[in-house]
């Protein structure tokens, strides 16, 4: 079996590529980083360090690589013969790889019609569907019909902390022990592709929301509260009992929303929350607070990690979630001048107040009870950024 994976960065090597290799695929990485591509070609293997209570080294073998800029024809050839195509390139790059994926499908349709599955492993909702639309734009009507019959575009949700890192060996990558790869099965063509460690589900929606309202919510809260106390990493922030209790309160609130909406076991979801808290406190990882906190305007969105669970909590339970409100207030205090969104957010607050910022970016009218709660928490965080 052969898998073509776009993106030989830390997530590509440390998460997706390692699972595919363990599943028996010959993995061909496709990237533009000439050093990484060259080393993968020369060595055919790399090291993954799993940073748990005890560090474990895993060797990923039987891999190769191609440069998508200088070896485009070879990339087309391997797609034409592949069993699986995956990506971990970042959402903005999906349109850039679509032309070569489309060319690979065109070559494939000319020589064979065996099923191919495409899975975009990106930190976005419906990432594979987005890639599919970009690819279809480069195909004729007849080729689009062939794609609908022989290519399964499978949406997925991925979760593994792979922190920013610098290693002596450019191919080595450190990851946390926990991972989740949930793949929606509805568009499978023929048989489900064998992927060790992944699980196929009928409806991906609840899994995406569980991660967004737990992992992303908690991560953001720890970062914004940690920033106010001048911590450098999420791990440092989570060792502050006050911050940890704030995060636990917010995740209890977002968890109540999930349990109510999806009919889940409260006990099982609280175990998931406990696991998530443990991941944030992993002393073997160093998760930079400025990296986690960046792009606050996006994270203040009405469908994102803080406002969405808070608004739904208000609607479901008729009261304000004070833990989530404190997280939103801390986000509004994030003023790192190196972050363009943080600078724009602070300018909006200076001109229109936090009510104006919440209206513009979170879609919250001033009369919404959450706004008053956020204002109260915000005012308690003075200009010296004390909690």
From Swiss-Prot:
GO CC annotations?
cytosol
Q: What is its EC number?
A: 1.1.1.17
Listed GO molecular functions?
A: mannitol-1-phosphate 5-dehydrogenase activity
Show the catalytic activity: D-mannitol 1-phosphate + NAD(+) = beta-D-fructose 6-phosphate + NADH + H(+)
Q: Does the keyword Oxidoreductase apply?
A: yes
EC category: oxidoreductase
* UniProt keyword Transferase present: no
Question: Which family, according to UniProt?
Answer: Belongs to the mannitol dehydrogenase family.
What HAMAP family does the database record attribute to this sequence? Answer: Mannitol_dehydrog (MF_00196)
What name is this protein filed under?
A: Mannitol-1-phosphate 5-dehydrogenase
Give the species. Geobacillus kaustophilus (strain HTA426)
């Amino acid at each position: 079996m052969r898998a073509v994976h776009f993106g030989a960065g830390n997530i590509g090597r440390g998460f997706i590529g390692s699972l595919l290799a363990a599943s028996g695929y010959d993995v061909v990485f496709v990237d533009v980083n000439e050093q990484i591509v060259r080393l993968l070609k020369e060595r055919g293997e790399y090291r993954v360090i799993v940073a748990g209570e005890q560090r474990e080294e895993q060797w990923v073998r039987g891999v190769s690589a191609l440069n998508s800029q200088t070896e485009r024809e070879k990339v087309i050839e391997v797609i034409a013969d592949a069993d699986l195509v995956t990506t971990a390139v970042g959402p903005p790059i999906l349109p850039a790889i679509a032309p070569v994926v489309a060319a690979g499908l065109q070559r494939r349709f000319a020589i064979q019609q065996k099923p191919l599955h495409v899975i975009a492993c990106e930190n976005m909702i419906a990432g594979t569907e987005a890639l599919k639309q970009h690819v279809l734009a480069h195909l004729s009507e007849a080729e689009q019909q062939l794609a609908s019959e022989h290519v399964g575009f499978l949406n997925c949700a991925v979760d593994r902390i792979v922190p920013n890192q610098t290693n002596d060996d450019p191919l080595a990558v450190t990851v946390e022990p926990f991972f989740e790869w949930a793949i929606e099965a509805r568009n499978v063509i023929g048989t489900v592709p064998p992927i060790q460690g992944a699980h196929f589900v009928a409806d991906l929606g609840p899994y995406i929301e569980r991660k967004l309202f737990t992992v992303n919510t908690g991560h953001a809260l720890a970062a914004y509260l940690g920033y106010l106390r001048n911590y450098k990493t999420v791990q440092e922030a989570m060792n502050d009992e006050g911050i940890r209790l704030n995060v636990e309160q917010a995740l209890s609130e977002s968890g109540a929303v999930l349990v109510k909406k999806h009919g889940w076991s409260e006990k099982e979801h609280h175990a998931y929350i406990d696991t998530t808290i443990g991941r944030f406190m992993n002393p073997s990882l160093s998760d930079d607070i400025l990296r986690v906190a960046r792009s606050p305007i996006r994270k203040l969105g009405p469908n994102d990690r803080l406002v969405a669970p808070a608004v739904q909590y208000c609607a479901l339970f008729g009261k304000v979630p004070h833990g989530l409100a404190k997280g939103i207030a801390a986000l509004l205090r994030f003023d790192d001048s190196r972050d363009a969104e943080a600078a724009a957010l602070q300018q909006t607050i200076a001109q229109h107040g936090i009510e104006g910022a919440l209206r513009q970016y979170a879609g919250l009218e001033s009369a919404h009870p959450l706004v008053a709660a956020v204002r109260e928490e915000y005012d308690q965080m003075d200009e010296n950024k004390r909690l």
